[in-house]
Regions:
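A detector for small-residue-rich transmembrane helices and their helix-helix packing motifs
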Residues: 1-156
Length: 156
């Protein structure tokens, strides 16, 4: 998480003020934690710790503020367009929430991503005009993922 934060906080602080960055960070953290609480409410043995939601909020804010950004994943030396990474990240996160077979805070990641997108729109409304493709893809993927989560939660 801190490695990701180190590389992407500068994108957000470049576009938003320092205070806005801090609010975005902590609000994404809280939203991620609240979603985790909702999803795992009936699982008394579930525990999580870390800044997953906050860091994911910063990452997705960066994707919106700089739609032409390219990312590289460890061991894959090929630049990936931000919107492709965003789709893959959300889909993997939804899979992880459903599978619950590892010790990763997928629900915090999802909540943080949603918080990062919403707060970025609040702070920089021009993102709607400058990042139409990225915003459309992230919102559509997030909506579909949200419906899948809701359906899975209601089946249990």
């Amino acid at each position: 998480n801190m490695f990701t934060l180190y590389f992407y906080f500068s994108f957000v602080t470049y576009s938003l003020r320092a205070l806005s960055f801090l609010i975005l960070y902590f609000a994404s953290l809280i939203i991620g934690n609240l979603l985790t609480l909702v999803i795992h409410f009936n699982q008394p043995n579930y525990s999580a710790v870390g800044a997953s939601g906050a860091v994911t909020g910063i990452l997705f804010s960066s994707l919106l503020l700089f739609p032409s950004i390219e990312l590289m994943i460890f061991f894959i030396p090929i630049p990936i367009p931000g919107y492709i990474f965003g789709i893959g990240y959300i889909l993997y996160t939804i899979y992880g929430i459903g599978a619950q077979n590892d010790n990763i805070g997928h629900s915090a990641h999802f909540g943080g991503a949603v918080g990062g997108v919403i707060l970025t729109l609040f702070y920089d409304f021009d993102v709607i005009y400058n990042s139409k493709l990225m915003l459309s893809i992230l919102c559509l993927t997030t909506l579909v993922a949200g419906f899948l989560l809701y359906g899975k939660k209601n089946k249990n």
